[in-house]
């Protein structure tokens, strides 16, 4: 009874305090109801009571998926140019298959019985066996276990640098030669096989046929790394659609081509970026798994591909060093222009200028192909420690690279960030092709770190014994390759890269058109000149007699004029230290 009276009295006091209304319990109910609704369906709660920011964002066009499964990116801006949600960059390689996969070195297959041997699970005690038979079985098992251990050891040594498998250069007398051979092995390891080239050729041919089927006046051209043989395994393919009449970059045409490719089962994971400065379609070709980017009515990439191939022909060692630097930056996520990294064209320009301005190459003291190791270390030293990013820009003069002060480049003035990389576009002097590489400080640190790592590794292995060198890698200190196991087959000489052939044909056709236009203009001009000459001849015939009558009066002034000319010239000689423009 006492307990009941206490609880009753306490409840009365609470009612008296709130004038007989239990406000506290009502408040709890009001708070709990929206919490339950949010936890059950947050989206409905947001839709009922949107905030001011959400109301503003709802007014903007949203990314959406069309009925045929095409992702339309409406919010892309000029800053998003070059970004790829699958690769992160137009020239950013993806491992094949696309799912993340640990690198596997080429090794002998380990069968189920051998795995059991390694785990010692196959041993069955047989009472009828003699001691000799058991000894033989034990010896055989030990041999098999030893072989398995050797194979596993090889796999461990080559997890991150599989290009050294069966390519031992540890007995080289000069460490620089060891690094040179290892660079060549790496380039051969990642170079395309015949099958890869044929797959890419077939993929482009199929896409081109589909484009021409949709637009008979259009054509598909390849540019970028595939058209120059500077692509890494899994790199995407950059294409451009050009037409006789132009205007294919419109929003409707982007959707039309995307839908057309999807209906023909030539495109999956399709994205249409219509509002960027460079409208583009991104998709994956399902049969090959290759990522493809298609732009419209822009030929500057085709022009750049021709120029780069000329550089490759004239510059020994350019391809090898470019592929090494590309893989180096890719492994560190510094090759994505969208995040401030270095693009493919910028990398090529850096290596090209480095080789063409190297003093020992200019004087023919060294062959670049035989000194790739030293050149790679010096490249990292130049752009990691010594290059003046604050003041110096890279340009070209008569087709050769030059350094010049940033302050004299009016197109990039005013310079907002002095510590930046400035590379003049060889095809457009007003264009800075590296303006998007705002993360140059991290790139410089990476280059400097690579120089330190390589030099330290060279000193370490130089003092090591040949036994300790076995299975070691110099290049592996700065280069990591994680992807599908490959063979050491550079089969570019066995099959033609159609992208290169078609690019060359494009330029030949264009040069013929320009030549024909110039020839037509010259023909019209020469015809007009010939007609004018005949008319002038008929008109000037009568005054010819007057010239004979005036011969004698003109002879005396001629002498005076020659004397005046002589005096004038002699005075100029005194002023210009003997220079006479008339006598040269």
Swiss-Prot record:
Its main location: nucleus. Keywords: ATP-binding, Cell cycle, Cell division, Magnesium, Manganese, Metal-binding, Mitosis, Nucleotide-binding, Nucleotidyltransferase, Nucleus, Transferase. Its cofactor is Mg(2+); Mn(2+). GO terms for cellular component: cytosol; nucleolus; nucleus; TRAMP complex. Changing residue 378 to A: In TRF4-378; lethal. Changing residue 282 to A: In TRF4-282; lethal. Changing residue 502 to A: In TRF4-502; lethal. Present with 7550 molecules/cell in log phase SD medium. This is Poly(A) RNA polymerase protein 2. It comes from Saccharomyces cerevisiae (strain ATCC 204508 / S288c).
């Amino acid at each position: 009874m006492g307990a009941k009276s206490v609880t009753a009295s306490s409840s009365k006091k609470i009612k008296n305090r709130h004038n007989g209304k239990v406000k506290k319990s009502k408040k709890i109910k009001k708070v709990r109801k929206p919490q339950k609704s949010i936890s059950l369906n947050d989206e409905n709660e947001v839709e009922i009571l949107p905030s001011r920011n959400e109301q503003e964002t709802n007014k903007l066009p949203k990314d959406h998926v069309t009925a045929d499964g095409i992702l339309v990116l409406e919010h892309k801006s000029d800053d998003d140019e070059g970004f790829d949600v699958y690769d992160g960059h137009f020239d950013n390689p993806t491992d094949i298959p696309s799912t993340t996969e640990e690198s596997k070195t080429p090794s002998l297959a380990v069968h189920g019985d051998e795995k059991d041997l390694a785990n010692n699970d196959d041993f069955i005690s047989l009472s009828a066996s003699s001691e000799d038979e058991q000894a033989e079985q034990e010896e055989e098992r030990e041999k098999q276990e030893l072989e398995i251990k050797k194979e596993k050891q090889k796999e461990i040594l080559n997890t991150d640098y599989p290009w050294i498998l069966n390519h031992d250069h540890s007995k080289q007398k000069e460490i620089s030669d060891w690094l040179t051979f290892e660079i060549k092995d790496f380039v051969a390891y990642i170079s395309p096989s015949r099958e890869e080239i044929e797959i890419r050729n077939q993929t482009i041919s199929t896409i081109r046929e589909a484009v021409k089927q949709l637009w008979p006046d259009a054509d598909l051209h390849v540019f970028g790394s595939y058209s120059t043989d500077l692509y890494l395994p899994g790199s995407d393919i950059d294409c451009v659609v050009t037409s006789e009449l132009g205007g294919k970059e419109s929003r409707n045409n982007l959707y039309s081509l995307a839908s057309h490719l999807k209906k023909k089962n030539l495109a999956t994971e399709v994205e249409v970026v219509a509002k960027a400065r460079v409208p583009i379609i991104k998709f994956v070709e399902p049969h090959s798994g290759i990522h493809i980017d298609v732009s419209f009515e822009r030929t500057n990439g085709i022009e750049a591909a021709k120029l780069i191939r000329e550089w490759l022909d004239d510059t020994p060692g350019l391809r090898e060093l470019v592929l090494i630097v590309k893989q180096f930056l890719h492994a560190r996520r510094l090759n994505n222009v969208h995040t401030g990294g270095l693009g493919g064209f910028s990398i090529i320009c850096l290596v090209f200028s480095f080789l063409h301005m190297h003093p020992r190459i200019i004087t023919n003291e060294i062959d670049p192909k035989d000194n790739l190791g030293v050149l790679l270390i010096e490249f990292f030293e130049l752009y990691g420690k010594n290059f003046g990013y604050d003041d110096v820009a890279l340009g070209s003069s008569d087709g050769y690279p030059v350094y010049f002060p940033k302050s004299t480049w009016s197109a990039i003035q005013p310079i907002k960030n002095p510590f930046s990389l400035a590379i003049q576009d060889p095809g457009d002097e007003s264009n800075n092709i590296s303006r998007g590489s705002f993360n140059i400080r991290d790139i410089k640190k990476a280059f400097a770190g690579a120089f330190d790592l390589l030099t330290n590794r060279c000193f370490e292995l130089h003092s090591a014994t040949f036994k300790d060198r076995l299975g070691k890698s110099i290049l592996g200190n700065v280069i990591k390759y994680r992807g599908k196991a490959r063979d050491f087959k550079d089969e570019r000489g066995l099959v033609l890269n159609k992208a290169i052939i078609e690019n060359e044909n494009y330029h030949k056709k264009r040069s013929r058109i320009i030549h024909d236009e110039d020839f037509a203009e010259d023909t019209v001009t020469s015809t007009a000149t010939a007609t004018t000459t005949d008319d002038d001849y008929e008109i000037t015939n009568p005054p010819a007699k007057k010239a004979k009558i005036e011969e004698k009066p003109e002879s005396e002034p001629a002498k005076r004029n020659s004397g005046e000319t002589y005096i004038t010239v002699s005075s100029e000689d005194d002023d210009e230290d003997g220079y006479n423009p008339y006598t040269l």
